[in-house]
A protein has these predicted regions:
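Acidic (Asp/Glu-rich) catalytic motifs at the cytosolic membrane interface
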Residues: 16, 29-58, 96, 100, ...
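Aspartate-rich (DDxxD/NDxxD/DxxxD) Mg2+/diphosphate-binding motifs
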Residues: 53-75, 105
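Topogenic membrane-insertion module of multi-pass membrane proteins
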Residues: 1-23
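Alpha-helical transmembrane segments and adjacent TM-loop junctions that form the membrane-embedded core
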Residues: 6, 73-265
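Residue-level hotspots within pore-lining transmembrane alpha-helices
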Residues: 15, 38, 121-125
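Flexible interhelical turns and helix-capping residues at alpha-helix boundaries
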Residues: 19, 27-30, 107
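Short, charged cytosolic
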Residues: 46-61, 136-146
């Protein structure tokens, strides 16, 4: 699986999330909606996360040294794991805290049309970023399901941005529906419910990302089809009598370490 993808997706998401974060923050000051504030914090967290992913890509390109003879490819795994922690702590935990506060102390939403207009604007930008992530990921996904792609991918940035953008889009839908319900019913508790929903959604996504990126950080081997191709290449040599053992581990998205115990003729 090639590992050069992801840069376009990250940059697109970074620009979109930064613009969305500013728009949502402006919307919060106008409407006093806690769901809008939670979404603003969410978008600022996503923006910082894309910056961390770009940092990881840059640091991974450092040349090997005597202390790091296999290079710095794992930097991309590490920073992807940090992203999951930021999403959980800054995004999910804050949204849950703000949601509980809003449910206990509801506050009417001001300027409904401003709130809905800003959320629709954010949905358009986020949908474009998500479409870009899906388009680039589809190339690497192949015939596998999206769930399988997230588990199999050795390129950490694509699943991270894909799930972040999906979470952001769904969070906007939650915020839009709950802000509308709060105004229709006259019950501002719905605004808090929307904020809590966003917090739960971000928490689930952060946990999934943490599990997958932790697995890459600890070390994952070649995919089954890659192991089969390596085995065929070794056993196809006339000098090889028997392949006793084969082990592999990704040292970075672009570096696969292979160790083989071979009996020669």
């Amino acid at each position: 699986m090639a590992a050069t993808g992801g840069a376009k997706t990250i940059i697109t998401a970074f620009i979109a999330n930064f613009c969305i974060a500013i728009a949502k923050l402006f919307g919060f000051f106008i409407t006093s909606s806690s769901a809008m504030l939670a979404e603003s914090i969410h978008s600022f967290a996503d923006t910082s996360n894309q910056a961390l992913l770009l940092l990881g890509r840059k640091r991974s390109k450092k040349l090997p040294s005597s202390e790091r003879p296999f290079g710095f490819g794992r930097e991309r795994f590490f920073w992807a794991f940090v992203v999951s922690l930021v999403l959980f702590s800054l995004g999910s935990m804050y949204a849950l805290y703000e949601g509980v506060h809003k449910v206990r102390h509801p506050h009417d939403i001001d300027s409904l049309w401003w709130a809905l207009g800003i959320l629709l604007f954010a949905m358009i930008l986020e949908a474009y970023a998500f479409k870009t992530a899906v388009g680039e990921s589809r190339y690497y996904k192949g015939k596998h399901s999206w769930g399988s792609f997230i588990k199999r991918s050795r390129i950490p940035e694509l699943p991270v941005v894909l799930l972040e953008d999906f979470g952001a889009l769904m969070g906007l839908v939650f915020a839009f529906v709950c802000v509308l319900l709060a105004k229709i019913t006259g019950n501002a508790v719905w605004d808090g419910v929307g904020t809590l929903s966003i917090g739960v959604l971000l928490g689930v996504i952060a946990i999934v990302l943490a599990i997958e990126t932790k697995s890459l950080l600890i070390g994952e081997g070649a995919l089954p089809e890659q192991s089969a191709a390596i085995t065929d290449a070794i056993t196809g040599s006339p000098e090889v009598l028997h392949l006793i053992d084969l082990r592999s581990e990704y040292l970075g998205p672009e570096t696969l370490l292979v160790a083989a115990k071979i009996e020669f003729r």
